[in-house]
Amino acid sequence: MARLAVFLLAVFLGGFAMSDEAQAADPENTLLLNLKDGQVVIEMRPDLAPKHVARIKELVRQGFYDGLTFHRVIGGFMAQGGDPKGNGTGGSGVNIPAEFSDQPHVRGTLSMARSSDPDSADSQFFIVFSRSRFLDGKYTVWGQVTKGMKHVGKIKRGDESRNGTVDDPDKIIRMRVAVDVK
């Protein structure tokens, strides 16, 4: 009986160790997004969108996203941020060619916002709250929330009659590439 208890304890603790390793498996392609309610861990997908992931990391390392707002948030759909103007019209000034894939937009997917021009993505991104099939193959998927989606779900919602525009919007407190965090 004692051996069984020791074995079960080892399996239990081993499961925790493996999950920690899985979260930190690729710190160069993991983002840590700090929101008012807590930290969100994002697995970036350079296998799906190498140019977008490279540009996001470049902007993150410049501190570009720190303090920017989630200017457009539609309940049951998504939260959009990454615009230095805070109104959906701004960016970093560098457009990225589309890298569409067959990766579905499921809860926690990060994808690039853009205009009607498929190659107009810049710095703005959105996180979907629920399965959004109508986006599949039309927007560049570059990441997935792996931890902290409950914090994303608490981002202040916008006025649906104004296409989700948020008065006094929540901000990105800080965004970092995990490998850069000491």
What are these regions (language model features)?
Residues 1-8:
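Bacterial N-terminal signal peptides that target proteins for export
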Residues 8, 12-182:
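Cyclophilin-like peptidyl-prolyl cis-trans isomerases
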